[in-house]
Amino acid sequence: MNQDHLIVDLERLTVRAPDGLLPDVLVGTGIVDGYVRRSSVLGDLLVAFGSKGVTAVELAGDPSGFVTTYEQRFGKRVVPVDRVPAAIARHLDTAIVAGRPGRLPVDLDRLTEFQAAVLRAAATIPRGEVRPYGWVAKEIGRPGAVRAVGSALASNPVPVIIPCHRVVRSDGTFGDYSLGDPSNKRRLLVSEGLDVAAFESRAAHGVRFTGSDTTGIFCHPTCRHARRTGAGHLVEFASEQDARAAGYRPCKVCRPVAA
């Protein structure tokens, strides 16, 4: 029995099923994927999921457009549902607020191994911090693949939950964002406590790393350790090479690299 026959048979049940039962049954059997609406800093989101976890996140606009795009991208129907599987429901709202999956199951099976590795690395960037594309490339063992990293982040199917908004260009500019225009990237980072204006000012003046003259350690400027350094002890560097030449060693937490 194919999925269309099953849908017809379910619709022909002589006893009226509770509203929402048909979509929930279809999603539960894996015949189609489901989606729900959730709130976020950027407004309402449409969050899709399948049997293995969350598959897509988009800004809530025209649901029919979301459905069409989803089916084109994933080759599977997606329908609105009333109920979310417990394994997802338990952690979904927390993941959206935290900007990282945590214990929320996320299905990256439709991605290439490289794309999935890029997203897993991005998911480790702490809330309110940013890293350059080069950092992600080195984290996954592909230091020469900076441009490919950017492409993988641009096609991130689950933005907000996997925080591609925390990855910036090598010159410190924020760049594009897969979930709407670049201003959404700034809005998310501001909501996480990042002083966006200060970060952009440093970047515009060529500052890529900062160090503490008391510890002799240099960091990415948004690293939580760097932000604890008082202004009187803060040293700015244009490159990793400059920091090392001055006798500074890299932070073991943010692992600064030349982008």
Residue ranges and their predicted role:
Residues A122, C164-H165, L188:
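Structural signal for hydrophobic
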Residues T173-G193:
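Phospho-regulated, low-complexity intrinsically disordered regions of nuclear gene-regulatory
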Residues M1-P143, S191-A259:
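Basic nucleic-acid-binding alpha-helical/helix-turn surface characteristic of O6-alkylguanine DNA
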Residues A145-P159:
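Regulatory, non-catalytic segments
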Residues L153, S178, A258:
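DNA major-groove recognition helix of helix-turn-helix
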Residues V160-V168:
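Short Lys/Arg-enriched helix C-cap and helix-to-coil transition segments
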